[in-house]
Amino acid sequence: MIQQESRLKVADNSGAREILVIKILGGSRVKTANIGDIIVATVKQATPGGVVKKGDVVKAVVVRTKYGTHRPDGSYIKFDENAAVIIGEDKSPKGTRIFGPVARELRDGNFMKIVSLAPEVL
């Protein structure tokens, strides 16, 4: 589960390495984010020459969580790290590559561009 002040690894080549969650979008009572949820975050670490810089406020979608998620068929999936992909206003990724696997739940949230760029969908 991702909550306010959580730090996430960035799984794309937008220039950010680590982000810190400011807000989870989706209503005032939403406390935690899971796979496929959109968050507002600030960049804490960035690579030089990237699209985003340290201190930028960005929107991102959660693609991997340690907490995991249950699926309707009864299976359960969780990852070794918490990771997100930085997105623009039109839900398209700011980077051109996605690193590591992403969950199949992103298809339900209309993040098909992220799913198509990912090397593996679990």
Swiss-Prot record:
The keyword Ribosomal protein applies. It comes from the Bacteria. One of its GO terms (biological process) is translation. GO terms for cellular component: cytosolic large ribosomal subunit. The keyword Ribosomal protein applies. Pfam families: Ribosomal_L14. Keywords: Ribonucleoprotein, Ribosomal protein, RNA-binding, rRNA-binding. One of its GO terms (molecular function) is structural constituent of ribosome. Gene3D superfamilies: Ribosomal protein L14 (2.40.150.20). Belongs to the universal ribosomal protein uL14 family. Binds to 23S rRNA. Forms part of two intersubunit bridges in the 70S ribosome. Part of the 50S ribosomal subunit. Forms a cluster with proteins L3 and L19. In the 70S ribosome, L14 and L19 interact and together make contacts with the 16S rRNA in bridges B5 and B8. This is Large ribosomal subunit protein uL14.
